[in-house]
Amino acid sequence: MSSPKVAIVVLNYNTQELLEKYLPDVLATDYDNMDIWVVDNASTDKSVSFLQSQFQQQIHILISSENRGYAGGYNWALDQIEAEYYVLINSDVRVPKSWLRPLVNLAKSNPQIGAIQPKILDDKSVQYFEYAGACGGYIDKWGYPFCRGRIFDS
């Protein structure tokens, strides 16, 4: 039985340097039924020509003629992409090779799961969680945010 079809969708706006650094990790993902889509949100840098010259055979590129913003860019792209599961990631995301299958298995295991969000590690200090965009976090007694599952040093 084949794995469910997954579309990994990366929204890009002027992030050529980030794509150079992080897209190879996404391409190395160990999963047998996926397509990788980079959606260009009307970039003014050389992102599109870079993608076409370096990754044309490995990815699909959607080019928007206007910057639709973050949600608008993803919505525009998802209207054009067919898959059973969609993974929306930013161009600055580093993933290990085996990251995708556990997410798909979890989603398949419970039809009530509608979205899955990772704990985001700080790229410069991987022992720490990144706060930006954290969902379901807490605020400590001093007003500092922290994510569920964060390990505190004693």
Spans of features found by a protein language model:
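A conserved acidic beta->alpha catalytic loop
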Residues: D25, D40-S49, E66
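Short alpha-helix within the catalytic core of nucleotide-sugar-dependent glycosyltransferases
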Residues: L23-P24, V48-S49, N75, A83, ...
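Glycine-rich, basic loop-to-helix element that forms the pyrophosphate-binding segment
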Residues: I63-I81, S91
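Conserved donor NDP-sugar-binding/catalytic core segment of glycosyltransferases
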Residues: P96-A132, G137-D140
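Short beta-strand/loop segment that forms part of the nucleotide-sugar
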Residues: N33-A42, L62-S64
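N-proximal low-complexity "stem/linker" segments adjacent to membrane-targeting elements
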Residues: M1-A28
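Short, flexible, basic/aromatic active-site loop/helix in glycosyltransferases
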Residues: G137-S154
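Short aromatic/hydrophobic "clamp" motif used to bind/position activated sugar donors
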Residues: Y86
